[in-house]
UniProtKB/Swiss-Prot annotation:
It comes from the Bacteria. This is UPF0145 protein BceJ2315_57450. Coiled coil: none annotated. PANTHER family: UPF0145 PROTEIN SCO3412 (PTHR34068:SF2), UPF0145 PROTEIN YBJQ (PTHR34068). It comes from Burkholderia cenocepacia (strain ATCC BAA-245 / DSM 16553 / LMG 16656 / NCTC 13227 / J2315 / CF5610) (Burkholderia cepacia (strain J2315)). Belongs to the UPF0145 family.
Amino acid sequence: MTESNRSLDDLSPARVTTAFDLPGHTTVRSLGVAQGIVVRSRSIVGSFGASLQTIFGGNITLYTSLCEKAREQAFDKMLAEACKLGANAIVAMRYDSTEIGSGVTEVICYGTAVQVAHAAGA
């Protein structure tokens, strides 16, 4: 289903933005912060493989893959929470991460859950 055919009752990734408003839409209600948190650890095997990659330099693909999966999971959890709040869009979306222990990283995705309507003339 394309974004133009999707009901404004539905929250889709296409209506998530890092901007403070959604182009072509008017915010009619702010519902609060929606967030998704994922805590991931590296396996011993993964850490060993990544250590080998550091010998040669360049992109450490094992860690890149782990980070991408964690961000995707945090994003999906944020969308689910925003849906529970009744949102059909999220504005001011951000990611943050923190190492909370040796080899353990928290990834958070958060934004303001809102209800939007098509702007007049848009």
